[in-house]
Amino acid sequence: MILYPAIDLKDGQCVRLLHGDMDKATVFNTSPADQAQRFVQDGFSWLHVVDLNGAIEGKSVNTAAVEQILESISIPVQLGGGIRTLEGVEAWIEAGVSRVILGTVAVHDPELVKKAARLWPEQIAVAVDVRDGKVAVDGWTGLSDLSAIDLSRRFEDAGVAALIITDISRDGALTGVNVEGVGELADAVSIPVIASGGVAAVADIERLKARQGVEIAGAILGRSLYAGTIKPSEALIAAAA
């Protein structure tokens, strides 16, 4: 299982939100590039970056901060937040992003996502952000009428690298990962699934790995790393077991 430490960008700073609420942002580092380097030193092999302002505005906003991250580290980066055009995808891949995450556009224009996956094989992920059983859009400010499985099945055989499923009710709350919800999606599709939201302790990683059924491909670690409820070394050992 691959672990993805998360850097969420708001106004150029590294923050964590509670349940995706932009008004409940805690600044953990004013230098995202410095934070990225720390995660590399901790031994992580990937980095998960989200442009929070971009997710709400529908276009990349924290461009300078992302570029500084890309310049400061050599491990691969997956980036999401406000990327809703093929031109936007291309620009970030040319800038050095290894995997682009598409969320809102996956709901509104699935054909664009499929075309992106054809143009950039294994470099497109789909964000499946779930609240009250439905997929959220526009930086989690709106709800679609699609379930996680409904959305994900649109992209079977499309060449999408991963599905990133986030339980919004648990995001930033350190309440434990929704193993059942993650597992249900993983068993329903053939696309690798990455769990996000609520991973609070090494035990959550162990629970994801121990479940019966399709293997969970990865997990995103956010507040747990910043708050110290998970030690990177212990998390990486658990993920590799």
From Swiss-Prot:
What enzyme class is recorded for this protein?
isomerase
Which InterPro entries does the entry mention?
Aldolase_TIM, His_biosynth, HisA_bact_arch, Isoase_HisA-like, Isoase_HisA-like_bact, RibuloseP-bd_barrel
Major place of residence = cytoplasm
Chemical reaction(s) catalysed:
1-(5-phospho-beta-D-ribosyl)-5-[(5-phospho-beta-D-ribosylamino)methylideneamino]imidazole-4-carboxamide = 5-[(5-phospho-1-deoxy-D-ribulos-1-ylimino)methylamino]-1-(5-phospho-beta-D-ribosyl)imidazole-4-carboxamide
GO biological process terms, alphabetically, are: L-histidine biosynthetic process; L-tryptophan biosynthetic process
Give the residues annotated as active site: D8, D129
An example Gene Ontology CC term for this record? cytoplasm
Which GO-annotated molecular functions does the record name? 1-(5-phosphoribosyl)-5-[(5-phosphoribosylamino)methylideneamino]imidazole-4-carboxamide isomerase activity
Entry keyword Isomerase:
yes
Q: What is its EC number?
A: 5.3.1.16
At the top level, the lineage of the source is Bacteria
Q: Which UniProt keywords apply?
A: Amino-acid biosynthesis, Cytoplasm, Histidine biosynthesis, Isomerase
Family label: Belongs to the HisA/HisF family.
- The name on file for this protein is 1-(5-phosphoribosyl)-5-[(5-phosphoribosylamino)methylideneamino] imidazole-4-carboxamide isomerase
Give the species this sequence originates from: Caulobacter vibrioides (strain ATCC 19089 / CIP 103742 / CB 15)
Gene name, per UniProt, is hisA
